[in-house]
């Protein structure tokens, strides 16, 4: 049968919200419309966009926005129906699972830590951080591979916490998800034919191009349709699981 790989976008796929970034903006009562408009006009690259958005978050309060505060703001993230069933069933049948997203790393790592391996945490390519492993998975590594954007911790604060760096975490380019999928395939020994990708927007067509099963889920608009093999509009990842099981000949739940 061979090995299989499923690559999942996070925002509007695993997370039932416009984006993990937007969830934080909503909590703080701020808007990134200005930087978003500049990016769409080609006046900002993605690296500068992330830095501007982090500056917006940091300037939203007279008190320093610490790493711990930002983590707190992300608690209560709404999750998509069937997210846990999808990932757990795939793992139960030895399918390799990756999150490939431009969203914030905190949520992706929390998701990944829900599925711990039997191995102690270690720093690795596509792994989670020590803090998440300690807080969420009893110090164990995750079975998933995680690639996201977000923030970096800065120098210690007076209260013992850590600040937020002016420079963001930039692992996933808007149009570079296909390169991440290809690296995963090469490292994990999985063919394109045995790879499925699930995403909602044009930012995911790079993943689609490297996958034998490209699933457009909860479409943001119609543009990605021509790049996908399948379209699922209902916000239920159980339907995605059924499709992937059928495509790869896996047992269904």
Residue ranges and their predicted role:
Residues 32-39, 62-70, 120-122, 135-143:
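Short, surface-exposed acidic
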Residues 25-32, 58, 216, 228, ...:
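Residue-level signature of transmembrane alpha-helix interfaces in integral membrane proteins
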Residues 8, 38, 98-99, 195:
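Short glycine- and Lys/Arg-enriched binding-loop motifs that mark or flank ligand-binding interfaces
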């Amino acid at each position: 049968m061979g090995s299989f790989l499923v690559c999942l976008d996070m925002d509007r796929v695993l997370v039932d919200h416009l984006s993990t970034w937007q969830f934080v903006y909503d909590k703080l009562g701020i808007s990134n419309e200005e930087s978003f408009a500049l990016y769409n006009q080609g006046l900002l690259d993605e690296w500068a966009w992330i830095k501007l958005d982090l500056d917006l978050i940091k300037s939203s309060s007279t008190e320093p926005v610490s790493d711990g505060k930002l983590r707190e703001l992300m608690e209560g993230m709404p999750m998509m129906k069937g997210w846990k069933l999808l990932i757990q069933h795939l793992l139960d049948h030895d399918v390799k699972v990756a999150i490939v997203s431009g969203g914030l790393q905190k949520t992706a790592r929390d998701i990944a830590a829900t599925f711990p391996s039997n191995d102690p945490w270690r720093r690795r390519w596509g792994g989670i951080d020590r803090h998440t492993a300690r807080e969420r998975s009893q110090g164990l590594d995750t079975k998933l591979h995680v690639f996201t954007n977000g923030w970096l911790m800065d120098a210690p604060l007076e209260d013992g916490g850590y600040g937020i760096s002016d420079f963001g975490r930039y692992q996933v380019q808007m149009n570079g998800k296909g390169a991440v999928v290809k690296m995963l395939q090469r490292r994990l020994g999985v063919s394109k034919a045995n790879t499925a990708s699930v995403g909602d927007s044009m930012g995911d067509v790079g993943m689609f191009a490297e996958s034998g099963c490209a699933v457009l889920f909860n479409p943001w608009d119609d543009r990605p349709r021509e790049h996908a093999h399948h379209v699922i509009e209902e916000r239920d990842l159980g339907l995605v699981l059924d499709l992937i099981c059928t495509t790869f000949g896996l047992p269904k739940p």
